[in-house]
């Protein structure tokens, strides 16, 4: 028996297939989910989703915050945006990270600082997703 994982954004279905296990970033830390996990609904932080496929290989995905519902071996993840590591251009991600760091350094006022911090977290997560897929697998 396996888990059925569905990752949805407002615009598309990013993932919809069976998996062996996942590790995801919630607002209170990382959690691992195996088959027969206790039912839970949780808020998701900007972070990396690690997916172990039924063939034991791992895949990573950048999640940009949202919610997850787990129950009856079904995992539904609703997020603002998501990208599989293989779909992220490493050079573009690195450039976006540099721009986000520069924008944070020149941010003025509370609102600009908050927005720049959020952009930096998103950019950093995309780069870390690529690195995690390279280093782990």
From Swiss-Prot:
F-type ATPases have 2 components, CF(1) - the catalytic core - and CF(0) - the membrane proton channel. CF(1) has five subunits: alpha(3), beta(3), gamma(1), delta(1), epsilon(1). CF(0) has three main subunits: a, b and c. NCBIfam families: ATP_synt_epsi. Keywords: ATP synthesis, CF(1), Chloroplast, Hydrogen ion transport, Ion transport, Membrane, Plastid, Thylakoid, Transport. It is a peripheral membrane protein. It is found in: Plastid, Chloroplast thylakoid membrane. It comes from the Eukaryota. Belongs to the ATPase epsilon chain family. Pfam families: ATP-synt_DE (PF00401), ATP-synt_DE_N (PF02823). GO terms for cellular component: chloroplast thylakoid membrane; proton-transporting ATP synthase complex. Produces ATP from ADP in the presence of a proton gradient across the membrane. It comes from Medicago sativa (Alfalfa). This is ATP synthase epsilon chain, chloroplastic. GO terms for molecular function: ATP binding; proton-transporting ATP synthase activity, rotational mechanism. Its main location: plastid.
